[in-house]
Structures are given as structure tokens and as C-alpha cells.
């Protein structure tokens, strides 16, 4: 009996270990400005490993989030999906996306419920992932529950990134910077 319990415990622990993400295959592209950018569907691993996003790791590791932030968000994460539209060329994205991803890591947000799209300077992707979503500024973080948009963060915080994201996830009243 002890052997079965021990084996079950080991299987459970091993299956709960998060496997590191692999970058989504993507080729750097030349933007209309001549700058080399990422374009299309990407993930955090792309940002961590690409030669053109060296800013990401530096920003991610310099950010310190309040360890208490997000403790009350767990009940609100069920069914939550997030689409991130950003530009690797964009200073606002370079400032907000590492911070946002650090916050998601802190609350152990399921990366399977997160989609990241790197956009051109014209706010487009070759696959038109932005179609119908009214992306005018980057970064734009769109939060969905049951396939319906519940709210969005656009370009810069109204109060602070932590406060804004917390309000959106909890379903509290929140109006982004451009409304």
C-alpha cells in the first residue's frame, strides 16, 4: 500500500512540473523603418531567446513585483484567456510586456491560455490575428472569458500595471487610457 501511494505521489509531482516553453518558429523580419522585428505569433520563449529582443530579459529581471500582488486573483483565473498584441520595435511594449509576463508568472497563469502576437509598425500581422479586434496602439492586452472580451489594457497604465490588471481580472470597473 505504501509503495502504491509513493508511486502515485511521484507521478503527481512529476506531472505538475511546468515544462519550459520552446520558441514558436519565426523569422525576424525587416520593418518598414528598416528595423529588424519579430512578426506574427510568438511566445515568451521567443522574447527570451531572440537576438533582437535583448531588452526583454534585462527588463524582466530588473522588475520587482510585490510578492503579495495577485494572491486574491486565483479564483478569477478560471476560464480566463489573454491575447497580447505588441511590437518588438515599440518602447511601450518593451516597458510593459516584461512586467506583464512577470506578473503572470507570479500568479502562475497557465501559458496555454496566453497568446502573444508581434505586430508590424502598421499594427498588422501577416496572418491577420488582429482582424476585428481594433488594435490601434501597442501593447494591447485583451482579456477573454467564455470567448467574450471582458476588458483590455491599452499601451500604458491608468494607475499602475498591477492595479489595472488586477481590476480587469476581477471584473471590476476599469477604463483603459484611450476610452
Locations of regions flagged by a protein language model:
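Local sequence-structure signature of Cys/Sec-based thiol-disulfide redox active-site neighborhoods
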Residues: 74-106
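N-terminal leader/targeting and pre-domain segments
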Residues: 21-77
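Thioredoxin-like thiol-disulfide oxidoreductase module
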Residues: 116-137, 167-169
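Non-catalytic, surface beta->alpha helical segment in thiol-disulfide oxidoreductase systems
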Residues: 137, 142-179
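Loop/turn elements at helix/coil->beta-strand transitions in domains of secreted/extracellular proteins
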Residues: 78-81, 112, 146
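C-terminal motif of bacterial Sec signal peptides marking the signal peptidase cleavage site
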Residues: 14-15
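Positively charged n-region of N-terminal signal peptides that target proteins for export
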Residues: 1-4
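Thiol-based oxidoreductase modules, predominantly thioredoxin-like and allied folds used
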Residues: 83-88, 111-125
Amino acid at each position: 500500500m505504501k509503495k502504491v501511494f509513493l508511486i502515485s505521489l511521484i507521478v503527481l509531482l512529476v506531472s505538475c512540473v511546468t515544462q519550459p516553453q520552446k520558441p514558436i518558429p519565426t523569422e525576424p523580419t525587416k520593418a518598414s523603418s528598416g528595423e529588424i522585428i519579430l512578426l506574427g505569433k510568438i511566445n515568451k520563449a521567443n522574447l527570451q531567446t531572440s537576438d533582437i529582443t535583448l531588452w526583454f530579459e534585462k527588463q524582466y529581471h530588473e522588475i520587482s513585483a510585490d510578492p503579495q500582488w495577485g494572491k486574491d486573483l486565483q479564483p478569477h483565473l478560471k476560464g480566463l484567456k489573454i491575447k497580447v498584441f505588441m511590437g518588438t520595435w515599440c518602447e511601450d511594449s518593451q516597458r510593459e510586456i516584461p512586467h506583464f509576463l512577470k506578473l503572470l508568472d507570479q500568479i502562475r497563469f497557465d501559458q496555454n491560455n496566453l497568446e502573444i502576437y508581434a505586430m508590424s509598425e502598421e499594427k498588422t500581422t501577416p496572418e491577420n490575428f488582429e482582424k476585428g479586434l481594433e488594435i490601434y496602439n501597442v501593447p494591447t492586452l485583451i482579456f477573454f472569458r467564455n470567448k467574450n472580451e471582458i476588458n483590455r489594457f491599452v499601451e500604458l497604465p491608468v494607475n499602475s500595471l498591477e492595479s489595472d490588471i488586477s481590476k480587469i481580472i476581477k471584473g471590476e470597473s476599469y477604463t483603459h487610457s484611450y476610452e
